[in-house]
């Protein structure tokens, strides 16, 4: 078959396959056109679930006679004219495909009148070439679109329509979503001559909750928490149901709008779900009606045929913004106090450790304790320094302090006789700055290492905590602060505020920058190791810790933070283990020479080898 240009009707029918899925799709496209035309009242008449008739009447600006024929042509629109317009769309429609596609699979009639015309005009397209006929008609200012016999000329598509009740329920849901997007528009919906829905316009400054209750039900309204959250060009408004009262019925209420456009966006849903996860069960879903306003240049709506999805240019920023907005209103409603009492603190949020392989956990012990001899004896050059004492040593072991510590560890201790080397210790007691080669991951969080024929197990979570403490502890210069895209604002008591002000200089050395006013504190920057943490939980716990202290030493604060950071790895991979050990060897060379308890355990394979040889 030779290459040829498709006839207009066939081309439009192909496009209709994407745009017109069912009668509800037609209603959505036509009502959005009415909203773009500035309508304040829209009447929707449906017969037989939309298969027989869909009539949309509005009081918008109307269409001029000269433009009626173009309105039914494909890729004809008044909403964009250049690429710049496409990259900053503010209208609901913009492709110019809807009317042409709908008219190709139905008998469509368009009647319209503008305010400066004396009479109305009616247009309809028919025939193989979709020729448009225009004739005079009687009609007030505005537009009426009638769609008769949907899919009459595509029997295969018509066969897939569901029952009349099911199709109307889909239309009803579309109108609910649109009514929640535009409180300023009156929308009436009727089916088979009976009025089903009447959504009256809410005057400016009026009670939007009345329409919210009519659409989402009184149960949602009773447990709805209002959200008003803003940062830069981002604004989040709306309501989220209290997760403590979420039911399967309420969980069906998940409406999200981006610049007034109804969306089904996984990124937004994930941010909301993450904010509510501590209050929801594994099989529960949050209920919400949220409106996100964003600079049109920062969002691409031209990524889905039916415009159900969008793509954000700064998706991480949008995700964190929504997450913090929802979490903030939930915390304000719950009024969770900061941990200032004498109740026992929760255990550090880390993955379970292989205690048999890792030995004692120094981070689970008090910061001040008697020195404990290291699991591996240090080399003579180390001066016999107890390994368990240097986590509290000052200054800390930042990257720039590595050379200083190497010199300290290599300073010979006077009047000390060298020890006879033990069989399995030269690999760690020598001057080498490497743990060895990673062979595999054992028990999900331990690395099996080999060096010079000696095998050992290394507890990766413990190594990760030592590394974080090294990264957090300031040396000659303060730790580099990383500004937050969205500053974290928390309510604090007078005691907490006083403790923060006393610890401000110490926190600044750790890279934590904040500003306090009245009853609130705003965290503006944190060090790099804290960027991927849940700051909504960690920072209040840190404030609670500081409120109990009388002396604020950066090293002690860094050690507390390192103990309470959440591990980023539930299941370690070889690549992650190799990267971690490389960082530890670079920033904490002392761990290689003098491994602290709980970090490294030698594995003696000789008995197993001997047993195999004896068989």
Curated annotation (Swiss-Prot):
Region (Disordered) residue spans: 362-397
PROSITE patterns attached to this UniProt entry: DNA_MISMATCH_REPAIR_1
Cysteine disulfide partners in this protein: none
CDD domains the UniProt entry points to: HATPase_MutL-MLH-PMS-like, MutL_Trans_MutL
Compositionally biased intervals (Low complexity): 378-391
GO MF annotations, alphabetized: ATP binding; ATP hydrolysis activity; ATP-dependent DNA damage sensor activity; mismatched DNA binding
Single GO biological process annotation from the record: mismatch repair
Coiled-coil ranges per UniProt: none
Pfam families (UniProt xref): DNA_mis_repair, HATPase_c_3, MutL_C
Domain of life of the source: Bacteria
Alphabetical keyword list: DNA damage, DNA repair
NCBIfam families, per database record: mutl, PRK00095.1-1
UniProt family annotation: Belongs to the DNA mismatch repair MutL/HexB family.
Descriptive protein name: DNA mismatch repair protein MutL
């Amino acid at each position: 078959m030779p290459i040829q240009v498709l006839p207009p009707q066939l081309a439009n029918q192909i496009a209709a396959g994407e745009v017109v899925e069912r009668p509800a799709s037609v209603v959505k496209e036509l009502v959005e056109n009415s909203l773009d035309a500035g309508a304040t009242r829209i009447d929707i008449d449906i017969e037989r679930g939309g298969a027989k008739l869909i009539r949309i009447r509005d009081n918008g600006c109307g269409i001029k006679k000269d433009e009626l024929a173009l309105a039914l042509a494909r890729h004809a629109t008044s909403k964009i004219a250049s690429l710049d317009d496409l990259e900053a769309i503010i209208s609901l429609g913009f492709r110019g495909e809807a009317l042409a596609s709908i008219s190709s699979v139905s008998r469509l009639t368009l009647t319209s009148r503008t305010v400066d015309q004396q009479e109305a005009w009616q247009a309809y397209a028919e025939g193989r070439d979709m020729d448009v006929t225009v004739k005079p008609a009687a009609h007030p200012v505005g537009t009426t679109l009638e769609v008769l016999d949907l899919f009459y000329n595509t029997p295969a598509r018509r066969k897939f329509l569901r029952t009349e009740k099911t199709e109307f329920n889909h239309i009803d849901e579309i109108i609910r979503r649109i009514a929640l997007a535009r409180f300023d528009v009156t929308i009436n919906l009727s089916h088979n001559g009976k009025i089903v829905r009447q959504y009256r316009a809410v005057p400016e400054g009026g009670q939007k909750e009345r329409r919210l209750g009519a659409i989402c039900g009184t149960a949602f309204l009773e447990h709805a928490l209002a959200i008003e959250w803003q940062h830069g060009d981002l604004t989040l408004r709306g309501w989220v149901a209290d997760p403590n009262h979420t039911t399967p019925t309420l969980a069906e209420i998940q409406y999200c709008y981006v610049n007034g456009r109804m969306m089904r966006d996984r990124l937004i849903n994930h941010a909301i779900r993450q904010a509510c996860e501590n209050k929801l069960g594994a099989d529960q879903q949050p209920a919400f009606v949220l409106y996100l306003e964003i600079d049109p240049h920062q969002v691409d709506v031209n990524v889905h045929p039916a415009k159900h999805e969008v793509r954000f240019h700064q998706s991480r920023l949008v995700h964190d913004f929504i997450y913090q907005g929802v979490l903030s209103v939930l915390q304000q409603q719950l009024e969770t106090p900061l941990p200032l009492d004498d109740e026992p603190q929760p255990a550090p949020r880390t993955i379970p450790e292989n205690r048999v392989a890792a030995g004692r956990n120094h981070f689970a012990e008090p910061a001040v304790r008697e020195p404990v001899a290291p699991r591996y004896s240090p080399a003579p050059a180390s001066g016999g320094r107890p390994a368990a004492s240097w986590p509290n040593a000052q200054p800390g072991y930042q990257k720039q302090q590595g050379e200083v510590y190497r010199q300290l560890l290599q300073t010979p201790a006077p009047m000390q006789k060298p020890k006879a080397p033990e069989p399995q210790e030269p690999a760690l007691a020598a001057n080498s700055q490497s743990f060895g080669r990673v062979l595999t991951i054992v028990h999900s969080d331990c690395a099996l290492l080999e060096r010079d024929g000696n095998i050992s197990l290394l507890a990766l979570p413990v190594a990760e905590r030592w590394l974080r403490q090294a990264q957090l502890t300031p040396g000659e210069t303060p730790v580099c602060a990383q500004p937050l895209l969205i500053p974290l604002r928390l309510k604090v008591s007078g005691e907490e505020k006083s403790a923060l002000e006393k610890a401000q200089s110490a926190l600044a050395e750790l890279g934590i920058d904040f500003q306090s006013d009245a009853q609130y504190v705003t965290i503006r920057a944190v060090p790099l190791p804290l960027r991927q943490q849940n700051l909504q939980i960690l920072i209040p716990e840190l404030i609670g810790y500081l409120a109990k202290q009388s002396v604020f030493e950066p090293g002690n604060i860094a050690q507390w933070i390192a103990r309470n950071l959440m591990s980023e790895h539930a299941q370690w991979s070889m690549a992650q283990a190799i990267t971690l050990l490389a960082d530890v060897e670079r920033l904490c060379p002392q761990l290689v020479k003098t491994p602290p308890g709980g970090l490294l355990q030698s594995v003696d394979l000789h008995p197993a080898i001997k047993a195999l040889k004896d068989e």
